[in-house]
Amino acid sequence: MKILNSPKEAINYTKSLNGSIGFVPTMGALHEGHLSLIEKARKENDYVIVSIFVNPTQFLPGEDLDKYPRRLEADFEICKRAGVDAVFTPTPENMYSNDEVLIKAPKIKGYILEGFNRPGHFDGVLQVVNKLFNIIRPTRAYFGKKDAQQLYLIKQMVNNFFFDIEIVECETKREKDGLALSSRNIYLSEEERKRALSISKALKRAAKLSSKTKNIEEIEKEMLEILDVDELQYIAFVDRDFNHIDEIKPGNTIILLAAKVGSTRLIDNIWI
């Protein structure tokens, strides 16, 4: 397995390959969710490249940039065992210049929900993903459905910038008890983790109710009765194009939820 430390190294490496490239961009602290993306990429491509980069431009002031879990050697071992061909580990210094050409998230759909609660977050996400796509030039790139709004915006960017890349949507990976896997779960105390389960339980209940009623107010009311969080930031009902909807549309509805349990911010969703 090759370790690529700079954009130039990565560009030269990918130019030398003859075959399809599956790309899994990550911020490290790899877990089973990341592994499921890597495994899917491994099955569908001749080569698999994983990037590990804690991207500073997608963190807001006061967020967890400094304490975000970093365990590079353990991540390398996970990648090696999973059959990854190369890991790209750039630094902020070789990814960004002092005079950046900035990419901005769409004015409406980039600034609702996650974009409203974390203003500027998606500017940073799209900026770095655009750079990574230009460096790696993958055939396919793999993203989890847990970050549904991010997934939607990346697909829009791919269309807008005419990238010849297939974006592969991957199901959210969960613990046996239903908690959506996240690198930030390590921040949760035992008591907080138990309460965090109320998020997936509320979403599961919403999905079950949606087969009986299309009434969003009724579904949201039941979700609120289940939730046991310290700060509910939003419950939202949207279609696959992130337009707000007035009633459940079977096959074209995503229910999204963001909340803090203790000081840890968690997001989850369910596609109906």
UniProtKB/Swiss-Prot annotation:
Q: Which residues bind beta-alanine?
A: Q58
> A Gene Ontology biological process annotation?
pantothenate biosynthetic process
Alphabetical list of CDD domains matching this protein: PanC
Which chemical reaction does it catalyze?
(R)-pantoate + beta-alanine + ATP = (R)-pantothenate + AMP + diphosphate + H(+)
EC no. given is 6.3.2.1
Instruction: Provide the protein's localization.
Output: Cytoplasm
> Example GO molecular function term?
pantoate-beta-alanine ligase activity
Entry keyword set: ATP-binding, Cytoplasm, Ligase, Nucleotide-binding, Pantothenate biosynthesis
Q: Which residues bind (R)-pantoate?
A: Q58, Q150
Binding-site list for ATP: 27-34, 144-147, 181-184
Biological or metabolic pathway of the protein: Cofactor biosynthesis; (R)-pantothenate biosynthesis; (R)-pantothenate from (R)-pantoate and beta-alanine: step 1/1
Q: Which SUPFAM superfamilies match?
A: Nucleotidylyl transferase
A Gene Ontology cellular-component term: cytosol
Residues forming the catalytic site: H34
Q: Chief localization class?
A: cytoplasm
What the entry lists under Pfam families is as follows: Pantoate_ligase
- What more does the record tell us? The reaction proceeds by a bi uni uni bi ping pong mechanism.
Subunit structure and binding partners: Homodimer.
Explain the purpose of this protein. Answer: Catalyzes the condensation of pantoate with beta-alanine in an ATP-dependent reaction via a pantoyl-adenylate intermediate.
Family recorded in the similarity comment? Belongs to the pantothenate synthetase family.
Record's protein name: Pantothenate synthetase
**What lineage is this protein's organism placed in?**
Bacteria, Pseudomonadati, Campylobacterota, Epsilonproteobacteria, Nautiliales
